[in-house]
Amino acid sequence: MEMCGATALTWSHTICPSLHLPRSVSTREARRSFSVWCVSDQDPKGNKMIISVTGATGFIGRRLVQRLHADNHSVHVLTRSKSNAETIFPAKDFPGIKIAEEPEWKDSIQGSTGVVNLAGLPISTRWSPEIKKEIKQSRIRVTSKVVELINSAPDDIRPKVFVSATAVGYYGTSETQVFDEQSPSGKDYLAEVCREWESTALKVNGGVRVALIRIGVVLGKDGGALAKMIPMFKLFAGGPLGSGTQWFSWIHLEDIVNLIYETLSNPSYKGVINGTAPNPVRLAELCDQLGHALGRPSWLPVPDFALKAVLGEGATVVLEGQKVLPTQAKKLGFPFKYSYVKDALQAILS
């Protein structure tokens, strides 16, 4: 399985249509998006940035790189497979983008304005002990490497900001609790992963502004959670997973990209920031709204036992959600474009 930029511990399984990260994208789709970037030491709002990005070929990363490139910022794609990155970001469509394999990361990070860390193995299969270890280590390994390179950079060419993705899995799961940035961490495996992921990012040099964005389920047209849901609904086979009463803390792709972009440029954005929309919903409501937008019923739930048979321990994350609020983003005045899932789905499907 590949390293990808969804980093929000995103699910991908055919039996789990509502929580999916695409295994691949078409060349045409890939050329529209991007995922690894570098920032300069200028004020990002009015000047050119140099942004280094890990996880650049993922769902969020591709769109983020596209945005940065369109705004004439310099982007460094930090990858473990140069050939794969070059396929997704061909030079003729993305002139000026630098693609760097791991031995070249040091030169890319030094002199960058900022670094965005979106790398991590998708949690998209039955959890064996080996898979669980890799889910954690894929995140810790890349984050530790990036932090080491930032810290070793001379002061005058050290990045000024480090934006590291994490996930709402930090809070654990609950049908009754409401979580914000001040809430304690949960006690399950994914909460443990997120705690170690975040603590690794926080080892960065004290002079670097750090933002940890706990990302929810990202909704967009060309990937993420809707990639499997939409085809299933079009076949009149859509419905919630399990009871449907579990909370679904979502965010539109455009909003999460804008939040990361704003975090790069705005010094007020630091510490933990929840990357979720202001109005989370129960999974059954999401499915009802999706069915309505597509003119299809939401009537065929996937039973608990089927998910547990396929995903084992990992089914807990699908069957038990969490209600997470973006308290810090709202305090900072971040302008969510899509606060309600109905509006988000209509925009995606229009």
Residue ranges and their predicted role:
Residues 130, 144-188:
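Conserved Rossmann-fold NAD(P)-dependent oxidoreductase catalytic core, especially the SDR/UDP-sugar
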